[in-house]
């Protein structure tokens, strides 16, 4: 359910805003979205894994807060990020 180093680097490269960017809101939302997608798949197979479900809800809340922050700072960055990640259809 965690991301490998190569997968993290791939996400960083596709969502970074400049060459050394590893922690911007866009990168954090992309990593959280990937972890959420993986954990959702795990929970479909393991319905009674309640501790993982709790972690999933925490990650969703963290992503929601980051997206609200992005929307307050720049509506354009927010729109580009959610369309690129395919969240909130």
UniProtKB/Swiss-Prot annotation:
Pfam families given in the database record: Ribosomal_S15
A single GO CC term, please? Answer: cytosolic small ribosomal subunit
GO terms, biological process: translation
Q: Where is the composition biased (Polar residues)?
A: 8-25
Q: Where is this region: Disordered?
A: 1-25
* The organism's place on the tree of life at top rank: Bacteria
Look up keyword Ribosomal protein and say if it applies. Answer: yes
Which GO molecular function entries does the Swiss-Prot or TrEMBL record give? Answer: rRNA binding; structural constituent of ribosome
Claim: Nuclease is one of the keywords in the record: no
Which keywords annotate this record?
Ribonucleoprotein, Ribosomal protein, RNA-binding, rRNA-binding
As for what it does, the entry says: One of the primary rRNA binding proteins, it binds directly to 16S rRNA where it helps nucleate assembly of the platform of the 30S subunit by binding and bridging several RNA helices of the 16S rRNA. Forms an intersubunit bridge (bridge B4) with the 23S rRNA of the 50S subunit in the ribosome.
Q: Which family is this protein grouped under?
A: Belongs to the universal ribosomal protein uS15 family.
Task: Cite the record's note on assembly.
Answer: Part of the 30S ribosomal subunit. Forms a bridge to the 50S subunit in the 70S ribosome, contacting the 23S rRNA.
Q: Which NCBIfam families does the record match to this protein?
A: S15_bact (TIGR00952)
Q: What is this protein called?
A: Small ribosomal subunit protein uS15
Q: What is the lineage of its organism?
A: Bacteria, Bacillati, Cyanobacteriota, Cyanophyceae, Synechococcales
């Amino acid at each position: 359910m965690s991301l490998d180093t190569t997968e993290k680097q791939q996400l960083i490269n596709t969502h970074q805003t400049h060459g050394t960017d590893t922690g911007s809101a866009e990168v954090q939302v992309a990593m959280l979205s990937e972890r959420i997608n993986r954990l959702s798949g795990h929970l479909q197979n393991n319905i009674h894994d309640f501790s993982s479900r709790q972690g999933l809800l925490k990650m969703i809340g963290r992503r929601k807060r980051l997206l609200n922050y992005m929307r307050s700072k720049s509506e354009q960055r927010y729109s580009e990020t959610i369309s690129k990640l395919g969240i909130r259809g």
